[in-house]
Curated annotation (Swiss-Prot):
Pfam families reported for this sequence: PPV_E2_C, PPV_E2_N
Region annotation (DNA-binding domain) ranges: 234-310
Protein's job: Plays a role in the initiation of viral DNA replication. A dimer of E2 interacts with a dimer of E1 in order to improve specificity of E1 DNA binding activity. Once the complex recognizes and binds DNA at specific sites, the E2 dimer is removed from DNA. E2 also regulates viral transcription through binding to the E2RE response element (5'-ACCNNNNNNGGT-3') present in multiple copies in the regulatory regions of the viral genome. Activates or represses transcription depending on E2RE's position with regards to proximal promoter elements including the TATA-box.
Gene Ontology cellular-component terms listed: host cell nucleus
Identification of the protein by name: Regulatory protein E2
Length: 310
């Protein structure tokens, strides 16, 4: 069967367009790079971002409605070659909570918009981005008042160490606390060349906190008692500190793991601190075993970092 005239004309025009682009690219410094037939084929030329040459794609998984069973795969390219105002340029893809983009003549250009994809494949306008060992959670899934510059969530673990560790009574904001590191390997975090805003420093700790029975009305003298006294009842907790909308998103996700904790607070902040841009949520456990199970099974956006409110 012979294709119709319109189809033949469209294919011929596309082939000529690719040929002209390759001839133009061959006059640049990029002609010394290794190029394969796949790198220069028409199919890849018309793949997003269109009318650009692309190399070394990395698959990105997006989970819609927070479900791994409702996921789609997209591609972020290590190298993108586009013909801009200053001739041919070589850039790489970037990934953030909004989508996949590249910088075209100084402008961030998204070629995959996760919000639009969520409308097609999801119902709750919630999505998670997963690539290799990194994940991005969209703050828009819990609040319409989110800011575009989202700080990473830091896990704040205020703990009482095991019996073999010496602990001290700690006044929040005034003294340092004695903590013990959890045995085992420290979680690994690979810095992504796509999005420097997700850089973090890893420091893994485990503890549990005993809150003093006497509560001073002066917030500056409020203290957390970590001394191991016979008969004292301790409650294992984990504190997460970060940007409020991001914390709400984490708290929403934790509902899938209700059997791994007793309760979780709403977002709050200490009245004694001047920094109101960060909030805290506290997760309470019935014992250390449950807490350890929670930390083993629940994926938190960034690795644990010890932070004391000042």
């Amino acid at each position: 069967m012979v294709p119709c005239l319109q189809v033949c004309k469209a294919k011929a025009c596309s082939a000529i367009e690719v040929q002209i682009a390759l001839e133009s690219l061959s006059t640049t410094i990029y002609n010394n790079e290794e190029w394969t037939l796949r790198d220069t084929c028409e199919e890849l030329w018309l793949t997003e971002p269109k009318k650009c040459f692309k190399k070394e794609g990395q698959h990105i998984e997006v989970w819609f409605d927070g479900s791994k069973n409702n996921c789609m795969q997209y591609v972020a390219w290590k190298y993108i070659y586009y013909n801009g105002d200053c001739g041919w340029q070589k850039v790489c893809s970037g990934v953030d909570y909004r989508g996949i983009y590249y910088v075209h003549d100084g402008h961030k250009t998204y070629y995959t918009d996760f919000e639009q994809e969520a409308k097609k494949f999801g119902c709750k306008n919630i999505w998670e981005v997963h690539m290799e060992n990194e994940s991005i959670y969209c703050p828009d899934s819990v609040s319409s008042t989110c800011r575009y510059n989202v700080s990473p969530v830091e896990t704040v673990n205020e703990y009482n160490t095991h019996k073999t560790t010496t602990t001290t009574s700690t006044s929040v904001g005034n003294q340092d606390a004695a903590v013990s590191h959890r045995p085992g390997k420290r979680p690994r975090l690979r810095e992504s060349e796509f999005d420097s805003s997700r850089e973090s420093h890893a420091k893994c700790v485990t503890t549990h906190t005993h809150i003093s029975d006497t509560d001073n009305t002066d917030s500056r003298s409020r203290s957390i008692n970590n001394n191991n006294h016979p008969g004292d009842k301790t409650t294992p907790v984990v504190h997460l500190k970060g940007e409020p909308n991001r914390l709400k998103c984490c708290r929403y996700r934790f509902q899938k793991y209700k059997t791994l904790f007793v309760d979780v607070t709403s977002t709050y902040h200490w009245t004694s601190t001047d920094n109101k841009n960060y909030s805290i949520i506290t997760i309470i456990y019935k014992d250390e075993t449950q807490r350890n199970s929670f930390l083993s099974h629940v994926k938190i956006p960034v690795v644990y970092r010890l932070v004391w409110d000042k």
